[in-house]
Each structure stands twice: as C-alpha cells, then as structure tokens.
C-alpha cells in the first residue's frame, strides 16, 4: 500500500483554527506539490482531507475528487488516521491531507516503530510504501518533498 502524507500548505494565522485559509504563499505551495503529485499518483488514488479550510484548499489544488474526514481535523490521533486510510490493507494508494503533529507522529510510527515528534514542513508530502512479506510489514520512504524544491 502507498500512503502519501501531505501537510496542508501555509495558512493565515490568528483566525478560528478550522477557518484558517491559505496565504498566497500557501496557494503556490499547494499548486507546486499538486503538480508533482499529479504526475506520480495513479488514477485510483483515494484522497482524504481534514475539514479545516487550509486542508480543503490544499486538497483542491490537486483537481481531483476528495473526501473530507472529520477524524483528520487538527488534533487527530495517529490511530484515527490509520483507520481512515485503511492502513495497511487498502488496495489503492491513499493521500491524507492533514496537520502536524499527527502526520509527523504517524510517519515516525510507520518508519521507526515508535510514535514520536517528526517535523513535516508546510505543503510537503511524504510518500510511504508498505509491503508485506511473510507476515512482516515493511514500510519504506519513497519520497519526502517540500514545495520549495519543486
């Protein structure tokens, strides 16, 4: 299974948390990352977004249908994100558009076996792949890309 963790792009501060919209920089970050993702994601990819405006705007940059999942809102628990993604059993790739620190903690758990803080920059995407071999789940990092480098 492929799981792509895409942190929402840069958003305006100081507003009600769920209502914070992307800044001009954030819109550019989202567009850059969406362009890269569009070249690499299969058509069958399932896209799930937090209900926060900044996540919805980030997801919208991809130009594909996506589903808003309340369990991905700021403050999400790692177990809730895994359940929403059907990890590790989904037969199709899944993109999660969400928030720190949950995305970083999820990446840490899948890559290192321990849930701890790991920084994912605004607008960045981490592409994780899980393969099962003889009842072992092996997770590898295929890509970690910041929009600044695109």
Functional labels for PLM-detected ranges:
Residues 102-107, 150:
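Extended, charge-rich low-complexity interaction segments
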Residues 5-11, 96-103:
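Histidine-centered catalytic micro-motifs
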Residues 114-140, 147-149:
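Domain-level recognition of soluble alpha/beta enzyme cores
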Residues 2-79, 115-123:
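Active-site-proximal alpha-helix that buttresses catalytic centers in soluble enzyme cores
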Residues 3, 45, 90-98:
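Generic beta-sheet signal
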Residues 77-94, 102:
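Internal catalytic or translocation cores that form aromatic/hydrophobic pockets or channels
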